[in-house]
């Protein structure tokens, strides 16, 4: 999933013998994106003074850009890897629907520590929780894999096959005739292609075939996103 706006959040992790407080900004990232000197959220201004930047390539694609903008040593630099670890764990688990988050910039701009009770676990959990809140408030959008699909079908079955594909949220890209068969070219979300082989065989009496290959990631329609989030939240509640 990816974002459309920037969002700020903070979290205090406090237990007996443990303390960590993290303030951060989460936003979508694209290559070469500059860091502004200041952000404004809810009437508050956040000045940014970049001390260091770490780019983390993600195993599932895209990257996390982690920016240290902590002023006046409010958090020791030794706790930054723990904050990063907490953010990464939440990106991998997926704060929205359990799917990976990618192409995100996180700016840690403030926080607090305790001379005795602060440790790595406190800052890992504070970073994770602050990221979750900011991510959800940033209006994240879910991406889904889209496949190029070519279907070879007898002309008398073309209407049925096309109707079925359109019911699978397909975008029909073109049609042509080849050796007495019609070739139908479409872009279809991978999610909608489950059991397609069986459905196509049933529609055409086994006289059609298809090939598919990955094309791109695209934003899911808002009604589909709402359903995915709702299903994920009810599953979390059950667990």
Give the predicted meaning of each segment:
Residues 6-239:
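Accessory interaction regions appended to the cores of large information-processing enzymes
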């Amino acid at each position: 999933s990816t974002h459309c706006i920037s969002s700020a959040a903070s979290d205090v992790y406090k237990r007996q013998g443990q303390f960590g407080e993290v303030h951060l900004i989460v936003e979508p990232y694209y290559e070469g994106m500059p860091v502004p000197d200041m952000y404004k959220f809810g009437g508050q201004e956040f000045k940014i003074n970049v001390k260091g930047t770490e780019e983390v390539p993600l195993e599932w694609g895209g990257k996390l850009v982690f920016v240290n903008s902590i002023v006046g040593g409010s958090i020791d630099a030794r706790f930054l890897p723990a904050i990063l670890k907490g953010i990464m764990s939440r990106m991998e688990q997926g704060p929205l629907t359990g799917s990976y988050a990618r192409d995100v910039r996180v700016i840690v701009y403030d926080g607090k520590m305790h001379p005795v009770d602060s440790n790595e676990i406190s800052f890992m959990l504070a970073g994770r929780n602050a990221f979750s809140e900011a991510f959800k408030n940033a209006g994240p959008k879910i991406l889904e894999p889209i496949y190029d699909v070519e279907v070879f079908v007898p002309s008398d079955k073309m209407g049925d096959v096309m109707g079925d594909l359109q019911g699978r949220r397909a975008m029909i890209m073109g049609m042509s005739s080849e050796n007495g068969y019609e070739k139908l070219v479409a872009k279809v979300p991978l999610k909608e292609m489950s059991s397609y082989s069986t459905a196509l065989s049933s529609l055409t009496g086994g006289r059609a075939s298809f090939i598919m290959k990955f094309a791109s990631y695209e934003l899911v329609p808002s009604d589909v996103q709402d359903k995915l989030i709702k299903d994920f939240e009810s599953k979390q509640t059950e667990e």
